[in-house]
């Protein structure tokens, strides 16, 4: 009777602790994850490019795929500022451009000739900027097109012109592509002469030593011992993990000890049966030769 009551109590305690484990363990897993969203709504190709750059620079980053086909880049919260600076220096994420279909989509209203002309010039600028941005080593590009409204009755026409601004990696030999870039712009705009296209190249150079120094500075600032809530959470998570481990170990050892104590108590309560005889009866084959 005593052994049965003891077993019921142990079973009740164990079943009562199970809900606590189911709540504590997921909470600890959630707290141990300190990654935050860096950029969202990214296309897969651009997200992979950003992920590779971050990982090559020593940043622990992951890409999370969304249900809508876009991707999200997540990094450690301590390296959020460094990750933003690193990607901005490489022109990532890239600027989004509108195409001709998006600019001239039906609005239901009759546009004036001036509005249609403005849309056309803007569409040319967007398309050319997008094309030049796809060149390897180009971080960002802007194309400004000037199409003067010439009067057919006036003799002297003002020629069209275009200005191109390119921000690129200094390691890329982009000046060698300058004639091709000017030809690309001139051939894309009707009536635009080659010598009326001006291109401004701005190289961006950052030495490897400066890059490592910036990373070391951000890591030092992120890991310095300051009494911030984030540090308190990290210490609390570590303490909670240690406490839960000890708690589970204590439960296992205590349960085993209570089983052995119950077996010994039941053996001692049996009248006329020695402990050795009970053990031999409990384990068949013991003492047989």
From Swiss-Prot:
Q: Which Gene3D superfamilies match?
A: 3.30.300.30, Hypothetical protein rpa1041
A biological process (GO) of this protein is: protein secretion
Record localization: Cell outer membrane
Lipidated sites in chain (N-palmitoyl cysteine): 34
User: Pfam families under this entry?
Assistant: YscJ_FliF (PF01514)
Q: Which residues cross the membrane?
A: 233-253
Covalent lipid adducts (S-diacylglycerol cysteine), residues: 34
The protein's predominant localisation is: membrane
Which keywords describe this protein according to UniProt?
Cell outer membrane, Lipoprotein, Membrane, Nodulation, Palmitate, Plasmid, Signal, Transmembrane, Transmembrane helix
Renumbered to this chain, the signal peptide range is 1-33
Q: What do the Gene Ontology cellular component annotations say?
A: cell outer membrane
What does the record say about its membrane topology? Lipid-anchor
NCBIfam families xref list: III_secr_YscJ (TIGR02544)
Which family is this protein grouped under?
Belongs to the YscJ lipoprotein family.
PANTHER family xrefs? FLAGELLAR M-RING PROTEIN (PTHR30046), YOP PROTEINS TRANSLOCATION LIPOPROTEIN J (PTHR30046:SF2)
Protein's UniProt name: Nodulation protein NolT
- Name the source organism: Sinorhizobium fredii (strain NBRC 101917 / NGR234)
**Gene encoding this chain?**
nolT
């Amino acid at each position: 009777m005593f052994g049965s009551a003891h077993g019921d109590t142990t079973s009740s305690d164990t079943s009562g602790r199970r809900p606590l484990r189911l709540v504590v363990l997921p909470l600890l897993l959630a707290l141990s994850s300190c990654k935050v969203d860096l950029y969202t709504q990214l296309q897969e190709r651009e997200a992979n490019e950003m992920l590779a750059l971050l990982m090559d620079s020593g940043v622990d980053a992951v890409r999370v795929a969304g249900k809508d086909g876009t991707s999200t880049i997540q990094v450690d919260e301590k390296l959020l500022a460094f990750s933003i600076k690193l990607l901005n220096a490489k022109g990532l994420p890239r600027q989004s451009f509108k195409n001709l279909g998006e600019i001239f989509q039906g609005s239901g209203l009759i546009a004036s000739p001036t509005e249609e002309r403005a849309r056309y010039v803007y569409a040319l600028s967007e398309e050319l900027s997008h094309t030049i941005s796809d060149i390897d080593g180009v971080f960002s590009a802007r194309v400004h097109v000037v199409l003067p409204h010439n009067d057919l009755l006036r003799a002297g026409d003002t020629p069209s012109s275009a200005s191109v601004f390119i921000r690129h990696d200094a390691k890329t030999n982009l000046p060698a592509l300058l004639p091709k870039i000017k030809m690309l712009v001139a051939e894309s705009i009707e009536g635009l002469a080659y010598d009326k296209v001006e291109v401004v190249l701005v190289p961006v150079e950052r030495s490897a030593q400066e890059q490592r120094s910036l990373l070391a500075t951000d890591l030092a600032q992120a890991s310095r011992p300051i009494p911030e809530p984030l540090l308190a959470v990290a210490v609390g998570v570590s303490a909670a993990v240690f406490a839960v481990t000890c708690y589970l170990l204590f439960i296992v050892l205590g349960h085993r000890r209570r089983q052995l104590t119950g077996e010994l108590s039941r053996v001692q309560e049996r009248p006329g049966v020695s402990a050795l005889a009970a053990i031999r009866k409990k384990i068949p084959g013991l003492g047989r030769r």
